Structure formats: C-alpha cells, structure tokens
C-alpha cells in the first residue's frame, strides 16, 4: 500500500508541474505579442505587417540549419523595393506574402528594373548591363526597313548607319573652289581652273588661254620644282616657243598656241 501511495503522489506532482509550465508558456507568449504590438505601433507598422514580419522571422529560424534555409531566412516581408537592402527586390507572388529576394543577374528574366542587380536594368524581359541598354537604342535595327530618299531614291547615310560602324564618316557635299581657294587636286576647283602650287600651298588658278605665257614641261613631274606653278593650256592649245622671240635669248618665251 505504501508503494502505491508513493506512485500516486509522484504522478500528481508531475501533473501539477506540467500545468505550471503550460501557464507560464502562455503568459510568455502573450507578453511577446504585446511587446511586438508596442514595437509595431512605435514604428508606424500595422498589426498585419508586424504579424508578417514575425512569421518571416519564425520561418527563417525554422530553416536556419541548411544553406537553403539561410537564404529563406533573409527573405523579410516588404511592400516595395525601397524596403529591401541593396542587391534585393520586393517579390510579390500571386499567392502568399511579399518578401525581399536576391536580385536577378545579367541575362536573367525580369519584369522591371528593380528586379535586376545594380549596374543592370530590365530590357525586353531580360536583365542587361546599363551600358548596353544606353547604346542599343542608338544602333538602327537590322531588319532591312530603310527609307529611301524621296528626291533621289537612294538610301540615306542615317539609315545605313549600322553598316558604317567603325568607318570614317562621309564628307559633306563638296563645294568647288574658285580662283585663289586652297585645293589638293584640280577636281577641287571649278571648270576652267586647275590646282597649282603657290609658295608652299596649292590654290585654284585659271587655265591658260591662247597667247598667255606658259611653262614648257621638259621632264615629266617637273611641276614639283616650281614655286609659282602655272596651269596647262586650255584644250586645243599647246605650249610652244613664241616665233617672234629673238634667237639670242637664252630663255625662250613659251605661249599657248593653237595646235
């Protein structure tokens, strides 16, 4: 009988101890809830937001034992991208609460710029570097849709810009030079003029007509030795010795005469 009484007493003590522990745990839970509500009221959060935040923290503690658990533990509730730290964005699924997730890297799918990591932006549903997104609009599309010049029917240089990448830009419409204008070749001058040397430069000079003094070129390429170079005689004329010149003259005079 004494042993039976001892067993009953020990079971009663255990039941009493369990009841005390349950009461203390319930009181501790209520005090934590009150503390969270006080913090949320001071921080300007609504009760729903504080509940979501506590749920997210509990979820992180539950998965804290694995590597995946660590990433889930950092997914804090949010309402916009501004509430997340750098390198994260506010993910809003169709079902479930919003949470801060890791940003999307280059060539990953996206719906907005905020989803992409710093230095990239969302373009056509894919995260691309900012430099590429800036340059892309300036490169014409390679779809062959080019407009013709209404006046001449040719493709304009602007439409063919993607073909001219890396090539020097075409010159502006060339304006022919008049007498005294600088030049590089005779084609730079208007009709009736040639490009001739004048001191250390070349300028447009008039082509010689009949009776005008000319320079007889004895050797090919001797124009380069002249400081004041003359143009050649006009078409149908030739640079010949003047017949009335005196034979005693060492430097015989040449003029443009008919062939």
From Swiss-Prot:
Span of the signal peptide: 1-33
A GO biological process held by the record: Wnt signaling pathway
Coiled-coil ranges from the UniProt annotation: none
GO MF annotation terms: co-receptor binding
Gene Ontology cellular-component terms listed: extracellular region; extracellular space
Presence of the UniProt keyword Nucleotide-binding in the record: no
CDD domains: Dkk2_Cys1 (cd23015), Dkk2_Cys2 (cd23273)
Compartments reported by the entry: Secreted
Annotated region described as DKK-type Cys-2, given as residue ranges: 183-256
Family recorded in the similarity comment: Belongs to the dickkopf family.
UniProt comment concerning the protein's domains: The C-terminal cysteine-rich domain mediates interaction with LRP5 and LRP6.
UniProt-recorded name of the protein: Dickkopf-related protein 2
Organism of provenance: Mus musculus (Mouse)
Lineage of origin: Eukaryota, Metazoa, Chordata, Craniata, Vertebrata
